Curated annotation (Swiss-Prot):
<protein>
    <recommendedName>
        <fullName>Large ribosomal subunit protein uL14</fullName>
    </recommendedName>
</protein>
<keyword id="KW-0694">RNA-binding</keyword>
<dbReference type="GO" id="GO:0003735">
    <property type="term" value="F:structural constituent of ribosome"/>
</dbReference>
<dbReference type="InterPro" id="IPR000218">
    <property type="entry name" value="Ribosomal_uL14"/>
</dbReference>
<dbReference type="GO" id="GO:0022625">
    <property type="term" value="C:cytosolic large ribosomal subunit"/>
</dbReference>
<dbReference type="GO" id="GO:0070180">
    <property type="term" value="F:large ribosomal subunit rRNA binding"/>
</dbReference>
<keyword id="KW-0699">rRNA-binding</keyword>
<dbReference type="InterPro" id="IPR019972">
    <property type="entry name" value="Ribosomal_uL14_CS"/>
</dbReference>
<comment type="subunit">
    <text>Part of the 50S ribosomal subunit. Forms a cluster with proteins L3 and L19. In the 70S ribosome, L14 and L19 interact and together make contacts with the 16S rRNA in bridges B5 and B8.</text>
</comment>
<dbReference type="Pfam" id="PF00238">
    <property type="entry name" value="Ribosomal_L14"/>
</dbReference>
<keyword id="KW-0687">Ribonucleoprotein</keyword>
<keyword id="KW-0689">Ribosomal protein</keyword>
<comment type="function">
    <text>Binds to 23S rRNA. Forms part of two intersubunit bridges in the 70S ribosome.</text>
</comment>
<dbReference type="GO" id="GO:0006412">
    <property type="term" value="P:translation"/>
</dbReference>
<dbReference type="InterPro" id="IPR005745">
    <property type="entry name" value="Ribosomal_uL14_bac-type"/>
</dbReference>
<comment type="similarity">
    <text>Belongs to the universal ribosomal protein uL14 family.</text>
</comment>
<dbReference type="InterPro" id="IPR036853">
    <property type="entry name" value="Ribosomal_uL14_sf"/>
</dbReference>
Length: 123
């Protein structure tokens, strides 16, 4: 469960190291974001010569949470850290060209198929 002020790792090579959620998109009083939800983030730590810099405000899709996701068969998939993939504000396509770490099957769909195809492992 990601809410405002939550810190996440960037799971791509966009140049951001850590980001902070500043808004959960999708409803006026929506409080929490789960895997597959789009959030608004600001870059808190970035590497030199990256595509994004500290202070940039971007959209991101949540790909891993400590809370996890429950499958219809009753199993739960949890991760050690919260992580997201940064998106272009206009096209909502990933900024980076590589994805680090596993992503879940819940991301499969029309919007995030590119992220699933770039990921090294889909759980």
């Amino acid at each position: 469960m990601i809410q405002m002020q939550s810190m996440l790792d960037a799971a791509d090579n966009s140049g951001a190291r850590s980001v902070m959620c500043i808004k959960v998109l999708g409803g006026s009083h929506r409080r929490y974001a789960h895997i597959g939800d789009v959030i608004k983030v600001t870059v808190k730590e970035a590497i030199p010569r990256g595509k994004v810099k500290k202070g940039d405000v971007l959209k991101a899709v949540v790909v891993r949470t400590r809370k996890g996701v429950r499958r219809p068969d009753g199993s739960v998939i949890r991760f050690d850290r919260n992580a997201c993939v940064l998106l272009n504000n206009n096209t909502e396509q990933p900024i980076g060209t590589r994805i680090f770490g596993p992503v879940t099957r819940e991301l499969r769909g029309d919007k995030f198929m590119k992220i699933v195809s770039l990921a090294p492992e889909v759980l």
